[in-house]
């Protein structure tokens, strides 16, 4: 669904009032957080989607990494997961589902969590993901509502998975470009969480289907600030620039930009390729971390030690202005 449609539906839901519900549905948070005791809070999330790649094992890896990401974005540690499956068993052999589940289990195992069960329904197309429960210490919780003026913004993974997977579905994506995107999408965001901890960060969000620009705007609105992104500083996956020029955009790219129009202003030069990529729907994208400038080097060093070479400072947090988001383009 589009961000606009989801926002409308959630707006009509009843509010829940419980002092132990630390983070709920408000503010477009990445996951829910519930206090079991003063020392132990649980983090809960669920995510699933249709295949983006042909290999069922790799699809399972990507879907699991994407589901686990929300727990990492909150500063948490995944502990248990439940498989969520839609599968056309009257059309495809069960070996396909076995490979999907095997790929998901491999990523869950890498995360140090366990799969405790799941639920499967017959569907007209494949869908797979996880419901994940994690834990977080109160002093390590990160949310999208804690960005502060003066913070710098670090993006931990390059952008462009929407363009790559769209081109791949049409058999128009070079093998090396798809391989680079798969490597990024299957990488667990524990790397970003650990880097955020190294920088004592308290604000983060993961970049997924609504794209960098919308997720940044959501962080700005939740935090009561304005976020400024420098478009020309955005890191891109290998080969994405050519795919943008060839027009392999997702439908979500257009709807993401339409939703953001009233929340943002654009400064600087003419539209650039990187400006469009700011709205590209990501799958298992990186974390956007807001951190004090004095700790930015510690965060980047942690990321690069973990081979997240594309990690970059992409913007900053400003006092609240008329617009939640400012996109700055280089003036030639």
Question: What function would you assign to each model-found segment?
Answer:
Residues 1-332:
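Helix-biased detector of long, well-ordered alpha-helical tracts
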């Amino acid at each position: 669904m589009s961000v606009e449609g989801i926002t409308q539906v959630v707006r009509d839901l009843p509010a829940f009032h419980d002092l132990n519900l630390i983070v709920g549905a408000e503010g477009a948070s990445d996951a829910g957080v519930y206090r079991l005791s003063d020392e132990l809070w649980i983090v809960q999330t669920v995510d699933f989607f249709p295949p983006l790649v042909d290999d069922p094992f790799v699809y399972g890896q990507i879907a699991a990494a994407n589901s686990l990401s929300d727990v990492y974005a909150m500063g948490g540690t995944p502990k248990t997961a439940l498989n969520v499956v839609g599968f056309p068993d009257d059309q495809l052999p069960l070996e396909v589902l076995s490979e999907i589940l095997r790929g998901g289990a491999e990523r869950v195992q890498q995360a140090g969590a366990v799969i405790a069960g799941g639920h499967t329904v017959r569907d007209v197309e494949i869908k797979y993901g996880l419901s994940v429960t994690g834990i977080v210490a109160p002093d390590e919780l990160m949310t999208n509502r804690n960005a502060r003026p003066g913070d710098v913004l670090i993006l931990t993974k390059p952008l462009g998975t929407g363009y790559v997977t769209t081109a791949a579905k049409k058999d128009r994506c070079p093998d090396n470009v798809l391989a680079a995107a798969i490597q990024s999408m299957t990488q667990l965001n524990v790397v970003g969480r650990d880097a955020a901890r190294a920088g004592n960060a308290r604000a983060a969000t993961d970049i997924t289907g609504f794209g960098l620009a919308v997720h940044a705007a959501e962080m700005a609105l939740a935090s009561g600030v304005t976020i400024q992104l420098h478009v020309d500083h955005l890191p891109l996956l290998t080969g994405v620039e050519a795919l943008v020029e060839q027009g392999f955009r997702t439908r979500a790219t257009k709807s993401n930009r339409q939703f953001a129009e009233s929340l943002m202003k654009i400064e600087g030069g003419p539209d650039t390729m990187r400006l469009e990529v700011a709205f590209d729907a990501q799958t298992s994208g990186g974390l956007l971390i807001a951190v004090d400038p004095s700790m930015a080097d510690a965060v980047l060093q942690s990321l690069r030690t973990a081979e997240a070479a594309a990690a970059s400072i992409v913007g900053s947090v400003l006092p609240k202005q008329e617009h939640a988001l400012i996109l700055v383009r280089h003036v030639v």
